[in-house]
Amino acid sequence: MSSFAKRIIPCLDVDNGRVVKGVNFVGLRDAGDPVEVAKRYNSEGADEITFLDITASHENRGTIVDIVKKVAQEVFIPLTVGGGIRKLEDIYSLLNVGCDKVSINSSAVTNPNLINESSKRFGSQCIVVAIDVKRVADGSYHVFVKGGREDTGLDALSWAKEVYDRGAGEILLTSMDTDGAKTGFELNITRQVSNLVDIPVIASGGAGSMEHIKEAFENGASAALAASIFHFKEIDIMDLKKYLRANNIPVRI
């Protein structure tokens, strides 16, 4: 387990330029405005912010670029954008307006060379590969795409190793079994992937309490990503960091 400061990353779903999956902050003028929400998280002590662009229609993809441009002018913690990134030009257009990292998922599975090409061109520190996993009948974990609907048949550990070998700078590991359940992260796969690769692993899917986040860090994760527990103020980020520090987890306060 690395001794570097562990990171807390709120994740915002953005559809056609608006934050969806409700953000319930008292005193926030417009909870659907990504700039407002990002500023709030910045002031509350988040280490990074991830935007997941879930805009279905390809013609509206330019909107996320406009958002990143606005957010980057107001917020000074790293921004990651995922969703719909298929080619080098998509990555360039986001990095060019102030995005720090991009997260690629399905496109990495269909075109693994995108990992090599993007990390060579932009630097591996910019390239996060998102891996959505589910446990299958034989007890192993498979990689799923299309929002967890389609089993690729790929073994999650083999894919994580390949992603690392191809030059990814981080892995965003989401357990589809625990996602949204608030019952805790899938620690088994978090630990296995963290032990296998020599790059940071971001645990995602299942955070419901401060203890869950502590457990993810104790099982090798370098960062924890969550949405609703932060959006609905069930957990305050500063309180969480104080709790983690009291439990000997290194964090930036």
Curated annotation (Swiss-Prot):
Keywords: Amino-acid biosynthesis, Cytoplasm, Histidine biosynthesis, Lyase. Pathway: Amino-acid biosynthesis; L-histidine biosynthesis; L-histidine from 5-phospho-alpha-D-ribose 1-diphosphate: step 5/9. The active site is at residues 13, 132. The keyword Cytoplasm applies. InterPro entries: Aldolase_TIM (IPR013785), His_biosynth (IPR006062), HisF (IPR004651), IGPS_HisA/HisF (IPR050064), RibuloseP-bd_barrel (IPR011060). It is an enzyme of class 4 (lyase). It comes from Aliarcobacter butzleri (strain RM4018). It holds the Pfam family His_biosynth. IGPS catalyzes the conversion of PRFAR and glutamine to IGP, AICAR and glutamate. The HisF subunit catalyzes the cyclization activity that produces IGP and AICAR from PRFAR using the ammonia provided by the HisH subunit. The keyword Nucleotide-binding does not apply. CDD domains: HisF. One of its GO terms (molecular function) is lyase activity. The gene is hisF. This is Imidazole glycerol phosphate synthase subunit HisF. It comes from the Bacteria. Heterodimer of HisH and HisF. GO terms for cellular component: cytoplasm. NCBIfam families: hisF (TIGR00735). SUPFAM superfamilies: Ribulose-phoshate binding barrel. It is found in: Cytoplasm. GO terms for biological process: L-histidine biosynthetic process. Belongs to the HisA/HisF family.
